[in-house]
Each structure stands twice: as C-alpha cells, then as structure tokens.
C-alpha cells in the first residue's frame, strides 16, 4: 500500500485512500494519465504494480475487481514495453493471475502482439495453447481473436505448420472460425509451407504481406498501443 502512495507522490498527485474499488479506479486513471499523457512509464508501471498488490482484500467482495485487475495489467504491460523490459511482461502477468488459463482474453491478445512485434512469438506458444484448450475460455469474449493471433503471429511465423493445420481442424478452430476463415487460415499455412520449400533461408517476406491482408479481428477490444511503434523495440 505504501508503494502505491509513493508512486502517486512522485507523479505530484495526492493518493486517494484505498477503501474500495472507486479509489482503485482513480488510481487506474492516474496510471493511464502517467502512461499516455506524461510518458512517465516507470511511475505508471509502479502505480499499476502497487494497485494490483492492494487489490487482495477487494477481490472477494467487489465484482468490478476483474475489470480493474485487467486494466492495471494492460497499462503495466505497455509501460514495461516502453521501458524496453518486454522480457518481463508475461512473468509479471503470471504473478497476478497464477494460471495461464485464467488470463483475460484481451491481455492474451496484447501479450501475443507484443511478443510478435519484438520477434519472440515462442514465448507465448505454450500459454496460448493452454488458454485456448481450457473449456471455460471457449465462450469468452475475445476467444476468436486469441485463436487468430495464435495462428497468424505464433504458429505460422515459427513454422509449426502441422500444429497450425491441427488447430484449424480442431474443436478450437471450429468454434473460433467460420468455414471461410478456416479456409483462409489453411491458405496462409500452405503459403508458408510453399515458401519454406522454395527459399528455406528467407521464407517470410511475401507471407508477411499475406498475413497483413488477413489481420486478426480484435473487434475493437485492442487498441494498438504506443509500444507497437516504439523505437526501443526494434
């Protein structure tokens, strides 16, 4: 709790008393302002981290807790990325969710996109597989987007083509994609296979253009954050 006060003091704000979700909403707003307006990424992250730690007692008594927790995590992820600390992102998320299948869809989407952007899609492979195969996530908002991102930004770039085909044909694929989308996905996979045979050293350039033509449909859940173009990530 003192960490939360300290982080807000550094931002020049008077810390609200931590007596419920309304105060944590103010803290979340402060973190967002620090991140987006002031560009104070370290203090924004510290505010999110402290806010998450302060939520322990609230979790059992307020149904807004899940939304607040996700909000702190999403801002914290972006702040870490801006600080060029993207390697810490998923382990930090797991400190607060403990089980991979419990991570909200919008956070999975953000993590997949980040690790794809920095050229480390393998980091999210196992977590995405576990998440998609958890029965309680099948009906979750954003399930289809996680499946699309996993296919296009993890399996295909890694060259795991057989697993990509299996995903499309599996129960997950049937739930996530329409018949037309499944065919498009298979076309992308076969294009990757063809390019790998023709030029094993550099199969990805034309495929990247094809993937860009069929982006994952996040349906407005994800707004592409500043870190996607941050110079430190190149």
Predicted regions and their residues:
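N-terminal pre-first-transmembrane soluble regions of secretory-pathway and organelle membrane proteins
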Residues: 1-147, 151-156, 174
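TPR/TPR-like alpha-solenoid repeats
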Residues: 79, 114, 153-154, 184-196
């Amino acid at each position: 709790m003192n960490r939360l006060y300290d982080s807000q003091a550094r931002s020049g704000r008077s810390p609200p008393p931590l007596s419920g979700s309304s105060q944590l909403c103010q803290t979340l707003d402060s973190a967002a302002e620090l991140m987006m307006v002031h560009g104070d990424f370290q203090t924004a992250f510290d505010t999110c981290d402290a806010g998450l730690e302060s939520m322990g007692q609230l979790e059992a008594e307020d149904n807004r807790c899940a939304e607040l927790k996700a909000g702190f995590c999403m801002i914290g992820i972006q702040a870490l990325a801006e600080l060029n600390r993207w390697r810490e992102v998923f382990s930090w998320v797991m400190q607060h969710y403990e089980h991979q299948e419990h991570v909200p869809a919008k956070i999975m989407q953000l993590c997949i996109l980040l690790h794809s952007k920095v050229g480390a899609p393998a980091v999210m492979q196992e977590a995405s597989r576990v998440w998609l195969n958890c029965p309680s996530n099948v009906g979750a908002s954003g399930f289809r987007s996680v499946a699309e991102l996993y296919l296009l930004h993890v399996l295909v770039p890694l060259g795991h083509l057989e697993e990509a085909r299996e995903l499309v044909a599996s129960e997950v694929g049937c739930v996530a994609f329409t018949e037309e989308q499944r065919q498009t996905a298979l076309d992308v996979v076969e294009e990757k296979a063809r390019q790998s045979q023709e030029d094993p050293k550099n199969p990805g350039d034309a495929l990247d253009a094809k993937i860009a033509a069929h982006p994952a449909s996040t349906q407005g859940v994800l707004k592409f954050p500043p870190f996607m173009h941050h110079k430190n990530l190149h």
